[in-house]
Each structure stands twice: as C-alpha cells, then as structure tokens.
Amino acid sequence: MKKRILSLLLALMMVVLLLPVTALAAETGIDTSALDMEYYGRYRDKGYSISVYNCGEYISDGADGGLDVNKAFEEVTGIRVIYSNYDTNESMYAKLKTGGAVYDIVVPSDYMISRMIAEGMLQKPDMSNIPNLKNIDEKYLYQSYDPTNEYSVPYTWGVLGLIYNTKMVEDEAVVASWGALWSEAYMDNILMINNSKDAFGITFAYLGLPINAESAEQVDKAVVLLKEQKKVIQAYVADEVFDKMIGGEAAMAPYYNGDAVTMIADNPDLAFSIPMEGSNLFTDCLCIPKESQKRELAEMYINFMLEPEVGLANTEAIGYSTPNTKVYELLDEETKSDPDEESLAHCGYYTYIGPELSLYIDSKWAEVLTADEKYSAMIMPMFLGACVAGIIALNIVRATRKKREE
C-alpha cells in the first residue's frame, strides 16, 4: 500500500514538473524542449518590451495556421513585441534618420546596412549573446556590406525578378528580358516597383550598365527610360502588388522571389522569371539601431529568429531562401533549388554608392514620379523626407571627414 501511494506521489510530481513546459508548448505551438529556456527566461516577469520594425509580409504571423513567431517569442521570454512595418528600405532609413521613432530591431537589405554603418546608425550586438549565429552558413557572413560581421545577422536572401500572369503573358520569352516593362503591348497592365534603388537597378540592367550607379551620367540615362515607361504603366506599387497580381489586375510587375511564392500560392496563373540581363541578389539582415537602449533584449530576439523551428516557419510563410543551415536541412529538394544557380549567375548585390550619388538618385526618382501629376501628391511628402534625411547624412559625412583631416 505504501509503495503504491509513493508511486502515485512520484507520478504526480512528474506531471507537475512537466506541466509548465507542456502548457507553454501548447500555447506557442513551438517545441520548447529544443530551446535553452534558461537563456530565454532571463527577463521573464520584468515587464520588458522591444520594438521591431520589419518590412511588410516578412514574418510568420500565424495567419495560415503556421507559427506566430512574435507571439511565441512573447510567451517563451515574457518580453512583449511591439511590431510595425515599412514598405521600403528607403522609408525605414528616412524614419530612423529624422528621429521619427526608436526601434530595437530593423531588417535592412545589404546595401542599406553599409549605408547605415557608414553613417553611424547601427550598433554592434554582442555576438556571444547570439549563440545561434553558428547556424548561419559562413558564405553569408563577412560580406562587403559588413566585412567584419559586427553589425548584422543574416535573416533571408532572395532575388528581384518579374512576376507575371501566364493568362495575359502567354509567351515566356517576353518576360525573359526587363524590356517587358516598357512593352506597349501591355499598356496599362504593367506595374512598376515604387522604390528608387530597384527602379534604377532594373533600368541599369536593361541598358547593359552596372546595377550600381557609378556616375550622374549613368543615372541620367536611366531617367530618360523611366520617364518613357510612364506611358505604359498602370501604377507604381509596393505591397499593393499582392492584391493587384493575385486579383489578375495586371500582367506583370517587378518584385521579389519570396513574395512571388506567396502570390503564386494564391493565384496559380502567376509565374516568376529572372530576366537574362541580370538582377539584384540580396541579403536582408537583423540589425540593432544605434538609438536602441535594449541591446540584450534585441540580441535575444535575433537568437530566437535563428532557432531552426522558427526559421522554418518564417521560410515557409514568406517564401524567401534561408541562410540558416539548420533550416535548409529541413527543406524539400524543390525549395532548396529555387532559385537555381543558372538563373543567379548574372545577378549581383547592390552596394552603397555614397551620400552624394544616393541623394542625386532620390531627386531624379522624384522627378520621374512627379512628371505625372497623378503621382505628385503621393510622392512629394516622401521625397521631402528623403531629402531631409539625405542632407543630414551628407553633413554628417562631411563633418566626419573634416574632423579626420584636423
């Protein structure tokens, strides 16, 4: 009898001990047994929060029955996530540069990272507080945008291409070239990407020029073509591209491969092409802005994003390729080979071209958009903000140079 009672007590103790982990796993949908709960539980019940500023549609939010990554982080760590979106690298940069808000995590692309490093806008995380950094394939580390790998942790990689409707564009040869975006055969059925970096990069590639501007003269050549394009396009788009392409409202649009995967899943008539002239290959990274006062919390968030289960959820939800070796091992062969090496052979990275040329491109992009009154009201506030940010950046660079000379 005593042995039976003792056995029941031991069994009850085991249930009680396992209950918190089991309950937490049920709430978050994540296998907490694979997590270092001592590491993630350091700030539980402190009432802390972090502010994350990410591009739209760029995280698994549980909308399609997958893992809600931010909710899982909150429940595992006790740290509240204040999450907001931006539409382009440039709008994110302008908001941070003008002091519009303070964020603890941002997710810029490679060329923007190098710009933000040069202008002192990022702080160095303590990489020893991000043990999952070991999961990142070394070929994505120590790249030209962050050669010492002190400021950024790779999140995704991808490529810019053309998403098109096969019912409207029946000949694949049409979208084998960026020239499709100037085709009068698709008048009012062409969407153009609404950011200066990609718009000029596409045009440079079509002209057979380097995708990174090397002179004002190169920019001017692209401006001529971009102004000519206005007569055939339906609209300039950012996240609006999803509704328009999924809804069959346009024949084609330049956009990113991961987002193309999402759109194709909702409309099987859509397909994706990487034009033969080449395109932009990019890496987006998790970074900590200089103004953040919550570095250790941000490091924990970054580490959580590198957990295999979290990384897999993000990859499946957003469709972008992963630099995380542990996640890559879990993917099927079709996903691993998309995009294929042959298509990427002529692609390259954007680089930071300096404050003077960057400001010149921004001004010329505004000139392209405002050449049509239809877009003037929309773009002028954005342009003025970009100009203010650009002038501030230029003055900082000049002041730094002067100080060095002294």
Language model regions located:
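Periplasmic-binding protein-like
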Residues: 135, 219-228, 266-290
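Conserved C-terminal helix/tail region of periplasmic/extracytoplasmic solute-binding proteins
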Residues: 345-406
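Mature extracytoplasmic/periplasmic domains
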Residues: 280, 284, 289-347, 387, ...
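Sec-dependent signal peptide cleavage junction
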Residues: 18-30, 398-401
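Extracytoplasmic ligand-binding site segments that recognize negatively charged/polar headgroups
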Residues: 51-66, 87, 101-249
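Hydrophobic core
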Residues: 10-18
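Early extracytoplasmic/lumenal segment of secretory-pathway proteins
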Residues: 25-115
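A ligand-binding cleft/hinge motif common to bilobed small-molecule-binding domains
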Residues: 112-115, 252-269
